[in-house]
Every structure is written in structure tokens, then in C-alpha cells.
Amino acid sequence: SISEQIESTHESFEAGATICHAHVRNEDETPTSDPEKFALLKEGISKHCQDMIIQFSTGGRSGSGKERGGMLPLKPDMASLSVGSNNFPTRVYENSPELILWLAEQMRIHKIMPEVEAFDLSHIINAIDMHSKGLLFGDLYVQFVMGIKNAMPADFDVFEYYVKTVDRLLPKSLWCGAGIGKNQRILNEWCIKLGGHVRTGLEDNIRIDKETLAPSNASLVKIAKEICEQYNRPIASWKKAREILELG
């Protein structure tokens, strides 16, 4: 429910999370892009997690076509943006050029910073090209999504090449990584080690380890925080995170 999401977000915020990546669901638990539900979620997070960066998902799980961007007029700080298609375990994750450009345009209109979700090398190249043409609002922020079957593998050599590609084609760009399932912890470590940022949480991984289910999003945030401390990279406060991303 929305109230459960707000409570979970507050726990994660207290644990050190600075960005909330959010989806919403119907009462029957099916995914939706209903702007009214996103509005309630945004209101609750803004009230209980003041100044936390709110990021809405425009992914294909909760709708099709322009329905996926129906919540953008609510003006979250950020929104996810997929800039290419790829295979998932049982389906094609389709993002047509027309839809990509429309979503990017809506984000520019409403001054929303995209988090580009890259499931493939071509997505990284496309994101850099879109940024160079002024099609993306704000600085480029790319997330490498690794470990989904039939898509980008969680392989360090691949990861390192993607980091070098971003640094070569658009120096000083911001990037982060998301590891799916058992790959979450190792992606956290790779990102922190190489100077990037991390995503964690129950959407991508439901376990602390092979035998233990994660009790909450906050428990996974705490693991990421511990890795940061191991590499002497203290987690950013919400204020510092907004400075890094140049969000007001």
C-alpha cells in the first residue's frame, strides 16, 4: 500500500538512503502508472522524508506507451528513463525511439532529471548521444543494470568497460550500478570501489544472503553503507546528494 511504501521509505531514509525510486500498485497489487497514487506517495514522502530525492519509474512494468509518463506532471526530482529495448527472462522490454523521445521531452518540460537505465552498451551510447543533443534535462546520470537474464551480465570486465566508455565519451558524468538478485552486493562494491554511486533495495534483491530474506529496504541500505565505510567513502547526506546531482 502507499502507507507501507512511505513507512519503508522513511526507514531507508533514516538508514542513509538519499533517493527513493518509486513504483505504485493497484489494490489488487498489479503495477500501475496511476498519477493519483503517485501523487499520494510523493506527498507522504515529502512530508516524512523532507528533502529526500524522489524518483518516479516510467518503466514498462506498470503501463504501456505514453501511459508510462502520466505521472511526470507531478514534477518529481527525477524519473527513470530507458533509452533502448532488450530481452528480459520471459519477454521483450520494448522502448520505441518515439516513446523514448516523448518521455525525455516530458522530463524537459517539467524539469525532471532522468536516471538513464542502461541494460546494454547501446543504451549507454544512446544516452550520451541524447545528452549531447540537449534531449535530456540536467547532467547525464547513467545507471548500469546488471545481472538480468538475457541482458547485461554482472561481469567485472564488462562493468569496467562501461565505466571507461562513459568516462571516455563524456568525462565527469555521473553513473551508478544496480545488481539484480545475488549480484546486488557485488555491484555495490564495484561501484563504490571505482568512484560511482549505488542502488539497492527489495525491487532488485530480496535477500541478505543465500539463507536469509531481507526484512526491509533499510536492511539493504545498511549493507551498502557498510561497504562505503570499508572503502572510506562515507555516504552522502541528502544535502550533498542534491549538490552532486545539481538538484535544487
Model-derived regions, located:
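Mid-to-C-terminal alpha-helical segments outside catalytic/metal-binding sites
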Residues: 222, 226-248
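Conserved, mostly hydrophobic/aromatic
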Residues: 5, 12, 23, 79, ...
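Alpha-helix-loop-beta-strand connector modules within alpha/beta enzyme cores
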Residues: 30-56, 102-109, 161-172, 218-232
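Glycine-rich, proline-tolerant flexible connector loops at the mouths of alpha/beta enzymes
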Residues: 18-40, 88, 145-146, 150, ...
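Active-site beta->alpha loop and helix N-cap motifs at the rims of alpha/beta catalytic domains
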Residues: 2-6, 31-94
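Short beta-strand segments at enzyme active-site cores
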Residues: 17-27, 54-58, 117, 241
